[in-house]
Amino acid sequence: MRARFLSTLLLPVTLILMPAGTPRHAPAGPRQPAGPRFGLSFPAARSAAPVDGRLFLMISTDSSAEPRFQISDGQNTQVIFGIDVEGLKPGQEATLDGEVPGYPVKRLADIPTGRYWVQGLLNRYQTFRRADGHVVKLPPDQGEGQQWNSKPGNFYSRPRWVLIDPGKDEVIRIALDQEIPPIPDPPETKYVKHVKIQSKLLSDFWGRPMYLGAHVLLPEGFDAHPNARYPLAVFHGHFPYTFGGWRETPPDPNVPCVYSERFSLDCYNRIQDQAAYQLYRDWTGPGFPRVLAIEIAHPTPYYDDSYAVNSANNGPYGDAIMRELIPHIEQRFRGIGQGYARFTYGGSTGGWEAMAVQMFYPDDFNGAWIACPDPIDFRAYTVVNLYEDGNAYYYDSHWRRTPRPGFRNWLGQVRSTLEEMNRREAVLGSRGRSGDQWDIWQAVYSPVGPDGYPKPIWDKMTGEVDRDVAQYWREHYDLSYILRRDWKTLGPKLKGKLHIYVGDMDNYYLNNAVYLVEEFLKGTRSPYYDGEVDYGDRAEHCWNGDHTRPNAYSRLRYHQMFIPRFMEQIRKNHPANPDTLSWRY
């Protein structure tokens, strides 16, 4: 799960938005409503051809950063408005009038008189002609991990101060004359290597070349032991630019301190740097298991991550990773290439993925270490029971209208509701194209709608749940339901392989689903699941099973925590005549 908070203030917020608008970029037509309007355009120097995409206007009271970097689910969020544009020509103005919906302000006309730090941005779409016959317009990843505010090729304006007066009938013009530059390839080292392949499976689905990548951490002694073959540790998580949490040089003691609002820690950047260097020291030191560790780069046109499973909307990412990417890595870097010597681990999104791939490809992995997983039982889709609740935003009641919480702190104080979080996404993109958390769950789990985009699990404006879509989700991606449904055949393949950890005050209520899964697992027979479910007392997202350190520190130690446990699993569960010696040196 990808956090979208810029502050740890814990005040409740109320938000009401209008539905995401239709394109308003016609250069001529009836007179616009009175009041300020914004006319956004890009010059031919940026593109001589018309473009499609989502056009944003951002209004801020804070000039310490560009407004495009100030939009979040937190209390310090600034304001954003968005419309779709199709075939917008260079020099042609797209007009955002007072009725354009925004977040967290209802509409542009509701901005009070004042001087604001204003910026425009165009998140550009491309046309995909998929193998299923649908033609869709989506923002392809450009190496940034599906981040609209830093995507190479997107047009934007330099921010400037603008006086907005709701009583003044005027057009405020903004030129999107800047373009986000390409992202350079990450450097390689003796230990860190980068892999990129064109996937035939994904290219066939999307109707254009599509790629998968991975960052590979080689074991100490890799070159000195050319006959060694290694176990594979697959670390799942969000889009990685390079192998995360790793550095081969001592940290600079004079680097300026950066305060972490999330953990209320000063100089947290120094803590991260030191932990990254400690991983290098442990990894290269005596006694650490010699394995290949990889982080997979699999962004889709919907998100920074495919969730590593096959999907009607995303395509066959699960098979592409398992049948194309991983065999390529194991062949190139001398992996053992058998299920007993593969392991998967991760937290949040990576936690769900670790559990899902262990279940969907049970013979290909020998264990999953699952931290703070995204909802693994859709009876507790955070705080919504998709099979019984009628509305995702409010508790069902004839007389009351109580909002469902979306984010809390360790004391249970709510700082964002489910409605607010989803309304932000509605402004960022129509038809599930926000590139954010709730929309990617929908893109992964939903059937394809008649328009070629993911069929909504609920109405983004009202929160009304679609029970038919929920049933599709249950049969295909509700991991808890699938365990219960298929335990007779799946259970023997999963015995001793599921290890689940979560804080009992997870910020996103992800512990609720774990309780339901634990209830089933502890009651299993023939076989008993023989794994582990553990909880961190008052621990927030993303607790990973370490009772000895605060979450701010343990989250930096996944590899040291779990890779030694993989070796224990090989000793307990392996076929006849396994390779358990060549990589032990």
Predicted regions and their residues:
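General helical structural elements
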Residues: 6-8, 28, 419, 427-428
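Signal peptide processing junction and immediate N-terminal pro/mature segment
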Residues: 18-30
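Positively charged n-region of N-terminal signal peptides that target proteins for export
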Residues: 1-5
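Contiguous beta-strand segments within globular domains
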Residues: 32-42, 48-56, 209-215, 234
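Bacterial N-terminal signal peptides
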Residues: 7-18
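Non-catalytic cap/lid and distal C-terminal segments of serine-dependent acyl enzymes
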Residues: 45, 60-103, 107-585
